[in-house]
A protein has these predicted regions:
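Short beta-strand scaffold positions
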Residues: 30-32, 78
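Short N-terminal leader segment in a subset of presequences, especially plant chloroplast
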Residues: 10, 32-33
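Short, Lys/Arg-enriched N-terminal segments with co-localized hydrophobic residues
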Residues: 2-21
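Conserved structured catalytic cores and adjacent interaction surfaces
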Residues: 36
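TOPRIM fold recognition
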Residues: 23, 42-140
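Extreme N-terminal starter segment of soluble prokaryotic enzymes
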Residues: 25-28
């Protein structure tokens, strides 16, 4: 079973959860809200650190994250709105190599996107996703 570390942005430290050491997890996904990270965690089938910014992040905290996440594959999965675009711009400045994962604008929010759509965009970004995610919610 995969382990997703669900962390608010101010708690990135070394510890062990479910047999996986967070320091050994290579992939990190930055999301805006708690409901976003819970939905993403439900789709993933591999260990991933999921960091929630609670919609905003200060430049000082962003610089700290840059040090803490050095050497990891960082991805930003933000809502398709102005706040999401602002977050992406901040991360592009400090993490120019970060990958950006986009949901269809029709859903506007990560939390509002159907599970199958979220699985599809994560799979396109080379994440291992639960196959059953493609079958759930197709009628949404």
């Amino acid at each position: 079973m995969a382990v997703a570390f669900l962390l608010p942005y101010n708690i990135v430290s070394s510890f062990t959860l479910g047999g996986s050491d967070m320091r050994q997890v290579e992939k990190v996904i930055i999301v805006e809200g708690r409901s976003d990270k819970e939905k993403v965690a439900a789709v993933l089938n591999e260990p991933v650190v999921i960091i929630c910014t609670n919609g905003t992040i200060s430049d000082a905290r962003l610089e700290e994250l840059a040090d803490e996440l050095e050497g990891r594959d960082v991805y930003v999965l933000a809502d398709a709105d102005e706040a999401g675009e602002k977050l992406r711009r901040q991360f592009r400045r400090v993490f120019p190599e970060a990958g950006h994962i986009y949901i269809d604008r029709a859903y506007r929010e990560v939390a509002a996107a159907p599970i199958w759509h979220l699985a599809h965009v994560l799979l396109r970004a080379h994440f291992d996703v639960r196959i059953e995610s493609f079958m759930r919610g197709r009628g949404e």
